[in-house]
Amino acid sequence: VILYGRYKAKINHRLIHNAKKQGKLILVTAISPTPAGEGKTTTSVGLADAMNALGKKTMLCLREPSLGPVFGIKRGAAGGGYAQVGPMNDRQLRFIVDGLGGKVNGTPREDGFDITVASEVMAIFCLATSISDLKERLSRIVCAYTYDGKPVTAGQIGAAGAMTALLKDALDPNLVQTLENNPAIIHGGPFANIAHGCNSVLATKLSLSLADYTITEAGFGADLGAEKFLDIKCRYAGIAPSACVLVATVRALKSHGGVAKADLSQPNLEAVKAGAANLIRHIDNLKNGFGLPVVVAINAFPTDTPEEQAYVEQVCAEQGVPCVLSEVFAKGGEGGKALAEKVLEVMEDRPIQYVYPLEMPLKQKVEAIAKKSTVPTV
């Protein structure tokens, strides 16, 4: 362990190559996301605290949060008073023209910066299994084209070595702790809508080698993040979850039932019934599509009514999956013990039923994902 101050450290990523132990993996995903938020990360943290409270040696393994989306929602979680962040977001750096000094000083061209989580390098970084593998992957990045249309790679222009050197320390996963002093590895974090939306392979495999149980999450809804987690990350890394927690909220079901965001706090059982189709489809994807043991976690809000929560439980029972009320946001690990116990109960090692075989042509892969996994939303 390499210490960085009193509360955080890095773990040597090379430890996974000497690991013989393989713990159980638990995936946390959610129904289709809404502006109201579903609570995947909240549930993941609370579930890890709950399992440790039950005496289970558990590690949390998450992506690094991005400040971009936070500041993009008008300074959410960035303090009050005069806005120093939102209006000063340097979006102009996404569109840059340079080389305007004439023939002697360069060729005019357009370029721009990506935020880290939207970078191709981040996606590559999170799939790398060693520093040599990282260099090989970076060397294949296409950075330009010749005048006759042939691709030019980072390896061909001699940039791969320097890129790898800049990332060598970043390759070591970050060790932090939850509020209940349980270990959490936070490492990497590509967006799920443009990449695979999971934390690094190195971090997950390291956690599996250290703990009996590893809890991780996949970005966005189960049809996007979980699909990529299973079809890309798990297949490449040779891992598979023994259980899947599908997070749902009464508020999100109302949203999928057609209720405006401003009205989600009002009781509306009929809207919950209308939005339940979204939950049912996600359950079917995970249970019958991928063949995973599933537990639905109702992430409780103070505005939920007992009737609304009872209806969600009824829907889950009809689909043949257990449903547990999760109160980890309000009560921490104590509020997640019932969920932890149910996850431990259903846990089972099963082979993943992938959406597509690797040898399938690209167009057919996209069609398979669209037909088998994607969940339409209102």
How would you name each of these model-derived features?
Residues 2-378:
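Flexible phosphate-sensing "switch/lid" loops adjacent to ATP/NTP-binding sites
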